[in-house]
Amino acid sequence: MPRMLAASAAIIATTLAPLSAQAAGCEMTLHGINLSGAEFGQPGDPYGQGYIYPSESTIKAFADDGFNAVRLPFLWERLQPTLNGTLDATELSRIKDTVETLRDNGMVVILDVHNYARYHGEMIGTPNVPVAAFADFWKRLSAVFANDDDVIFGLMNEPHDISAPAWLAAANAAIDAIRTIGAGNLVLVPGTAWTGAHSWSQTFYGPSNASVMAQVVDSSNNFAYEVHQYTDDDFSGKNADCSKIDDAVSALNDFTSWLNANDVQGFLGEFGTTEQIQCLRGLKQMVDVVQQNPRAWLGWAYWAGGDWWPKDSPMIIHSNPRDGGTQQLRTLQPVLGSNTTRASCNTKS
């Protein structure tokens, strides 16, 4: 490509967010896309049938569109088939090859363990999946990419049905394991309750993320909080409506205030809408919150793209514009590729 698309109403141009405050030597605002596929299926499914990593052509298409980051979901069980065991060499090679392709295209990668705080369906912190096993996984994975400025560690996708104190203990153990082996990479820390911005201050799991997650401990002080936010009726992103646009934008503004009050930074790791006009308006408003608050936000990653999404998937931006998602891309286009320095993050330490 690239796809030169006419811009919709202008989105505020990005101001450089100091990613260097979180990832040494790298200053840019992350304008990302979730490239889905490696988290699909069940752990035992054959590669290429049950799951897939993004192809080189897909990665190049999104890089040419101006995206400078990819959130890369994958399954813990595939990479570490036995708790506390070695990483599977074949699966690790697939991840490393994908990272290299992203690097070749000038993109930062967020390694996203897409497991909802579970391993084979059992919660982290239970007898069969102790916190130490989660820390062990991150010790092993972080050693592979230690101090690569263009590799960010996303601790876990959307923990849920676990209390904030229990999740905090697991997150702190993983961060400690990462730092103990000498990896200084930026770490993205979610909360519980699906890490929704809308649920950040809610107490239906017990103490809120807002009251608990400020107690993250990182000896390198190189982390940011990851939240997700959708605009449909239940904030899940699974429905085609966008009836909660105002609530979603308000939630992001409230989370921005929490970030500023605690002198920390955030990352909007998932958000997206359908191509209905009112939904696109909400999409722009959510991007505006991040773009207008560069001291609080490192950036965002749209959900989603990837090789295996059906053409009729309502929120998906396809690498081939004929397959759908062009209206969402038009809405994001004004900030893609603007005021970023991808090359500064595209080096291995």
From Swiss-Prot:
pH dependence per the entry: Optimum pH is 4.5 with CMC as substrate.
Name of this protein: Endoglucanase
Gene Ontology BP term (one): cellulose catabolic process
A Gene Ontology molecular function term of the record: hydrolase activity, hydrolyzing O-glycosyl compounds
Thermal characteristics: Optimum temperature is 50 degrees Celsius with CMC as substrate. Retains 50% of its activity at temperatures ranging from 30 to 60 degrees Celsius.
The UniProt record lists the keyword Hydrolase: yes
Domain of life where this protein originates: Bacteria
Catalysed reaction, written as an equation: Endohydrolysis of (1->4)-beta-D-glucosidic linkages in cellulose, lichenin and cereal beta-D-glucans
Stored InterPro entries: Glyco_hydro_5, Glyco_hydro_5_CS, Glycoside_hydrolase_SF
Family, as annotated: Belongs to the glycosyl hydrolase 5 (cellulase A) family.
Organism: Martelella endophytica
EC number, UniProt record: 3.2.1.4
